[in-house]
From Swiss-Prot:
The keyword Acetylation does not apply. It holds the Pfam family RNA_pol_Rpb6. The gene is rpoZ. The lineage of its organism: Bacteria, Pseudomonadati, Pseudomonadota, Gammaproteobacteria, Aeromonadales. SMART domains: RNA_pol_Rpb6. It is an enzyme of class 2 (transferase). Promotes RNA polymerase assembly. Latches the N- and C-terminal regions of the beta' subunit thereby facilitating its interaction with the beta and alpha subunits. The keyword Membrane does not apply. GO terms for cellular component: DNA-directed RNA polymerase complex. InterPro entries: DNA-dir_RNA_pol_omega (IPR003716), Pol_omega/Rpo6/RPB6 (IPR006110), RPB6/omega-like_sf (IPR036161). Keywords: DNA-directed RNA polymerase, Nucleotidyltransferase, Transcription, Transferase. This is DNA-directed RNA polymerase subunit omega.
Length: 91
């Protein structure tokens, strides 16, 4: 298991407080939402995986915001298509 130093991850994010927010958000994506890790899992917990991704510069707040917006647009498009299909069935 590779050690993650907070100092290296802080350099990527800017400060410790933002690091906590970004790491928690990414760890939730991996653990709860089933997102695929961008690094090898190596039997690490989601929080360690998130910190390793941040340390390598693979994940930051902007990347996650962009991904969330894209997924939101996909979800809205799917919902509109479902509503249109239901409306066609009634018409």
């Amino acid at each position: 298991m590779a050690r993650v130093t907070v100092e290296d991850a802080v350099k990527q994010v800017g400060n410790r407080f933002d690091l906590v927010l970004v790491a928690a958000r990414r760890a939730r994506q991996i653990a709860v939402q089933g997102k695929d890790p961008l690094v090898d899992e190596e039997n690490d917990k989601p929080t360690v995986i998130a910190l390793r991704e941040i340390e390598l510069g693979l994940v930051n707040n902007q990347v996650m915001d962009t991904q969330d917006r894209y997924e939101q647009q996909e979800q809205e498009a799917a919902e509109l298509a479902a509503v249109a299909a239901i409306a066609e069935g009634r018409g």
